[in-house]
A protein has these predicted regions:
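A short beta-strand->alpha-helix segment at the C-terminal rim
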Residues: 137-148
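Conserved ATP-binding TGD loop and adjacent catalytic N/P-domain core of P-type ATPases
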Residues: 87, 167-169, 201-203, 209-347
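Hydrophobic transmembrane alpha-helical segments of multi-pass transport and channel proteins
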Residues: 48-55, 129-130, 353-354
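Single conserved hydrophobic/aromatic residue that forms the stacking wall/gate
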Residues: 1-8, 12
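Helix-interface capping motifs at the ends of transmembrane segments in multi-pass membrane proteins
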Residues: 14-47, 72, 350-367
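Generic enzyme active-site microenvironment
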Residues: 18, 91, 267, 289, ...
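ATP-driven catalytic headpiece of P-type ATPases
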Residues: 85-92, 98-131, 161-242, 320-321
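Conserved catalytic phosphorylation-site environment of P-type ATPases
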Residues: 39, 52-126, 280, 290, ...
Length: 367
């Protein structure tokens, strides 16, 4: 695809050649010698030498690419550097883009007669054999506190509900509010706290021993420190910010509110992001920001694909721009850089054309 700014150069070259030919013919038809007429035509070509015009875009692109690389923003092509500044909508994948992509323990709420360490120790023993992504957060938290996990037996994972196992003669269970509520006595106050955690976009995991609730451990994929500021900067630039996620609406709304996005599209399946981008493109020029394998089709479909540097190779290959620092704040920085480069190109082209508007008539003998 030719660079947008190269179109002006192509038109200019054709027009200059046409003007030179017309100049030569006019001087011949007005009775002047062929040498004089030819000299006028050649003068037009010489004075309109497109050096300034030819350098207007490449120099600005080179400087823009250099500044981008210096700041950890890689523009793969000149087109991506020129087009990023025209973006009207930015679609952000939630996991790994707005959030850290690594669930972590955010709250530990033990029952009245249970300590935090006791709750974590029993949760550690139960979750140690789990392969669920949320289990990793609890294991890391317990390990960071120097806790040790006791060995459990008769371990069972119940997809969509939770876990159960035997610890000596006792039965341990852990999982969702709905699951634990059917097997253990949950106080109204703890249930209320669990609801509030869920409304805040966190996942409350309840743990019980022999039918007695031990407490709640909340796990969440927290947003990056710079996410909210990056979203605000994009909005201040007149850009509509959309968050895409496969989460349920309640969790998605909570994360979206923390980040401050304009629109939340929840329940998006991994293979459904491309169709969402297609529909967004009907409203304006779209940039998609993502980091995962399932983001690659959407990155390709968007007008500008922006990949987080810490993401998968497939996402990076599919993108037009790569943020090497994996910071969301580099998205508005990349767009600002593109706009500054475009502004520089337009200024360079203006002065190049201004010179020729004055010089060509002089060379042609009009003045």
């Amino acid at each position: 695809t030719p660079k947008p700014s190269s179109a002006a150069s192509d038109v200019y070259k054709r027009q200059v050649i046409t003007i030179a030919i017309i100049t030569t013919i006019v001087w011949l038809l007005t009775g002047h010698e062929a040498g004089y007429a030819l000299a006028r035509g050649i003068s037009v070509l010489v004075i309109s030498c497109p050096c300034a015009l030819g350098l207007a875009t490449p120099v600005a692109i080179m400087v823009g690419n250099g500044m981008g690389a210096k700041n950890g923003i890689l523009f793969k092509t000149a087109v991506s550097l020129e087009e990023a500044g025209k973006v009207q909508i930015v679609a952000l994948d939630k996991t790994g883009t707005i959030t850290n992509g690594q669930p972590e323990v955010t709250d530990i709420l033990p029952a009245d007669d249970v300590s935090e360490n006791d709750l974590l120790t029993l949760a550690y023993a139960l979750e140690k054999k789990s392969e669920h992504p949320l289990a990793k957060a609890i294991l890391e938290k317990a390990a960071s506190l120097g806790l040790t996990a006791q060995e459990v037996t008769e371990f069972q994972a119940l997809p969509g509900n939770g876990l159960s196992a035997k610890l000596g003669a006792s039965t341990l269970i852990g999982g969702s509010m709905k699951y634990i509520n059917t097997l253990a006595a949950v106080s109204p106050s703890l249930m209320n706290q669990a609801e509030k955690l869920a409304e805040a976009g966190k996942t409350p995991l309840l743990f019980a021993k022999d039918g007695k609730l031990l407490g709640i451990i909340a796990v969440a994929d927290v947003i990056k420190p710079d996410s909210a500021q990056a979203v605000k900067e994009l909005q201040n630039m007149g850009i509509h910010v959309v968050m895409l996620t496969g989460d349920n609406k309640r969790t998605a709304r909570a994360i979206g509110a923390q980040a401050g996005v304009d629109q939340v599209i929840a329940g998006v399946l991994p293979d459904g992001k491309e169709s969402v981008i297609r529909s967004l493109k009907e409203k304006g020029k779209v940039a998609m920001v993502g980091d995962g394998i399932n983001d690659a089709p959407a990155l390709t479909r968007a007008d500008i694909g922006i990949a987080i540097g810490a993401g998968t190779d497939i996402a990076i290959d599919a993108a037009d721009i790569v943020l090497m620092k994996s910071q969301l704040s580099d998205v508005p920085a990349a767009i600002r850089m593109s706009r500054a480069t475009l502004r520089n190109i337009h200024e360079n082209l203006f002065w190049a054309f201004f010179y020729n508007i004055i010089g060509i008539p002089l060379a042609a003998g009009v003045w």
